[in-house]
Amino acid sequence: MLTIDGTFACASTGLEIHMIGTASHAAYPEAGKNPGPALARLLLEIEKLTEEYNRSRGFVRMTLIGMDIGSANYGVAASEGTLRMTVRAEREKVFAGYVDEIKQIAQNTADDGGFTLDIQEIERFPATENHAVNVDKLRKCAADQN
């Protein structure tokens, strides 16, 4: 029997953050809205948020999975982009707040740039947290059986 105090498995979810701007000819990028710079700033803001959470609220992690901006069409400035990441946290309450703050930062970034925003959560899993009292009861029962 395996027992562990505290968290056995972190809460986690994939996040797909998609921003849509306005296309323009590559010769006139100022006529469109390219989400590339906004997504880059968003990634940096999420990294700062992650550091702050780790300092003050407990273990969280953001793993960048990928970022796609535009397409291989050299005559058109990018008008869409997607940031993909996996986020996790040791405690469920911390995780919920962390994910909510990421979504709020994404919304603020999209609003500031005039982008349409779509956020998808992919395969959200709750934390598996073992409460000390219950772990102690389990250990006592196991010891009584030996």
Residue ranges of model-derived segments:
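Metal-dependent amide/peptide-bond hydrolase catalytic core
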Residues: 27, 36-146
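Fold-level recognition of mixed alpha/beta catalytic cores in primary-metabolism enzymes, strongest
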Residues: 1-44
